[in-house]
């Protein structure tokens, strides 16, 4: 069955490619807005909007995967930084503390529009850093298109002290949960 990733995220693309999956990417282009207040419901709502918007456009039978990731610290949602100063403030706020990364995933089968939404959460601790180290990391440029202003799979690995939970969730797609839902709910087997 055709698999479609409803995301422009290069990291999600890379994760699915690393699994050896044959898939197509179709960006959803939906507004990233949800009235949901709880982080898990918020990311599931956004992932649903992305997946369903792409599923409705398809003429052929497919499985559509939508995802959305946010970083939360003390009930404050951190999105992608707008500039260097905002990236510095985010990383300064995250250092020496624990935050939670939430990723919502929604899988839609276009044949009957059956869908399943779920989420994963992972705790991440960022090391205490000198201001110069924070600016040096920001100047790598890799954190600008990522929630929380860092990329655990890149140079950002140097600033992460430890994680508790699914590493791939922090990258942007909880692979194990995706595998389980595809198998259990849609009889799509990746192995």
From Swiss-Prot:
What biological-process GO terms show up in the record?
nucleotide metabolic process
Please name the InterPro entries in this protein's record. Answer: ITPase-like_fam, Maf-like
The UniProt entry, under SUPFAM superfamilies, shows: ITPase-like
Subcellular location per the Swiss-Prot or TrEMBL entry: Cytoplasm
> What's the EC number here?
3.6.1.9
Naming one, the record's GO cellular component terms include:
cytoplasm
Signal peptide (UniProt feature, chain positions)? none
Q: What cofactors does the UniProt entry give for this protein?
A: a divalent metal cation
Q: Which UniProt keywords apply?
A: Cytoplasm, Hydrolase, Nucleotide metabolism
Please indicate if the UniProt record lists Membrane as a keyword: no
Molecular-function GO terms, alphabetical: dTTP diphosphatase activity; UTP diphosphatase activity
Q: Where does this protein have coiled-coil stretches? A: none
Superkingdom as given in the UniProt entry: Bacteria
- Where does it mainly reside? cytoplasm
- Catalytic activity line of the entry: dTTP + H2O = dTMP + diphosphate + H(+); UTP + H2O = UMP + diphosphate + H(+)
Q: Where is the active site?
A: 68 (proton acceptor)
The record's top EC class is: hydrolase
Q: Ion transport as a keyword?
A: no
Site (Important for substrate specificity) at: 11, 69, 153
Q: Which CDD domains does this chain map to?
A: Maf (cd00555)
- What does the protein in this record do? Nucleoside triphosphate pyrophosphatase that hydrolyzes dTTP and UTP. May have a dual role in cell division arrest and in preventing the incorporation of modified nucleotides into cellular nucleic acids.
Instruction: Please give the family membership noted in the entry.
Output: Belongs to the Maf family. YhdE subfamily.
What HAMAP family does the entry give?
Answer: Maf
**What name goes with this protein?**
dTTP/UTP pyrophosphatase
Origin species: Thermoanaerobacter pseudethanolicus (strain ATCC 33223 / 39E) (Clostridium thermohydrosulfuricum)
């Amino acid at each position: 069955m055709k698999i479609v990733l409803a995301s422009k995220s290069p990291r999600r693309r890379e994760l699915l490619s690393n699994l050896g999956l044959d898939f197509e990417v179709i960006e959803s282009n939906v507004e990233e807005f949800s009235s949901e207040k709880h982080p898990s419901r918020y990311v599931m709502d956004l992932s649903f909007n992305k997946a369903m918007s792409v599923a409705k456009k398809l003429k052929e039978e497919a499985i559509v995967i939508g995802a959305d990731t946010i970083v939360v610290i003390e009930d404050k949602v951190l999105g992608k930084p707008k500039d260097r100063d905002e990236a510095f403030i985010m990383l300064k706020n995250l250092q020496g503390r624990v935050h939670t990364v939430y990723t919502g995933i929604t899988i839609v089968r276009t044949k009957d529009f059956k869908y399943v939404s779920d989420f994963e959460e992972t705790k991440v601790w960022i090391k205490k850093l000198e201001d110069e180290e924070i600016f040096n990391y920001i100047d790598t440029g890799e954190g600008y298109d990522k929630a929380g202003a860092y990329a655990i799979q890149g140079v950002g690995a140097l600033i992460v002290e430890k994680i508790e939970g699914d590493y791939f969730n922090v990258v942007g797609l909880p692979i194990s949960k995706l595998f389980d839902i595809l198998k259990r709910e849609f009889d799509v087997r990746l192995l």
